[in-house]
């Protein structure tokens, strides 16, 4: 029957893990981010303005996982990211020539998390306002004016932020305005490393515009993936991971026909066999890892009572 045929086809494709094609194409701008399926299962995703170009299943956003994703993709001119853990260490190793644009919206959110959207202290009101101004900067003159205003804020409130208070519980001195100090230090790191305004560098923009935010992947891809998972509540962790893999695959530039997918893509059995091999043999070194962290694949089928990570 037709229903039986549909179920057979569905079951057959559920056993497949679609892989990202390795094209060797060099992109001007690449966006990267991760979407968590559980506390320690995340799918890292890379895309351009037009297509998804890579994905990788991992335990966490550590440098090893990011390097595995990035190793499949030639270094782009610019990568737009939210500054997740482990990314910079991996970028230095795998994409050493790639410039970084830190998402300005995430930079603003990091400040807002410390000051709240209704800060009580005048220093917090001013810093929150400066962080909010980041979202509207579109030209070099505005960026220079912002840097000057931020430098003036740091000088104006330097003594205030240097105040310390004795913590009665620990007996140690701590910053009196600790949340403001944290917000300032975060912005200081972005400014000192020139990560906020890469999108305005004329040497880079001559090859095409560079977005200042990670909206393409956070709002354009992750939001759709979360909606898909909500619409299909009840899927096992394995099938949620596969659903994301399939969504990413059909949004690559040229997905293979169904017949070719069945011939070339790895199945659950293939990965089980690979995991058995790497459990007894050393890791291969002839190219980038293709599918995901070995422990992730194992835990999708057999939960382990302990946690292991690499970085």
Range-by-range predicted roles:
Residues 47-49, 69-74, 91-102:
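Short, surface-exposed basic-aromatic patches at helix termini and helix-loop junctions that form
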Residues 24-37:
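Two-metal-ion RNase H-like nuclease active-site motif
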Residues 2-9:
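Short, small-residue-biased leader/transition segments that mark boundaries at the very start
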Residues 33, 46, 50, 79-82, ...:
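Mobile genetic element proteins and their domesticated derivatives, centered on retroelements
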Residues 81-84, 88, 129-311:
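Acidic/histidine-rich catalytic cores and adjacent linkers
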Residues 52-80:
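Active-site beta-loop-alpha junctions of metal-dependent nucleic acid enzymes
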Residues 33, 82-131:
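Conserved beta-strand -> loop -> alpha-helix junction used to position metal-binding or nucleic-acid-contacting
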Residues 10-24:
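Short, basic alpha-helical nucleic acid-contact segments in DNA-binding proteins
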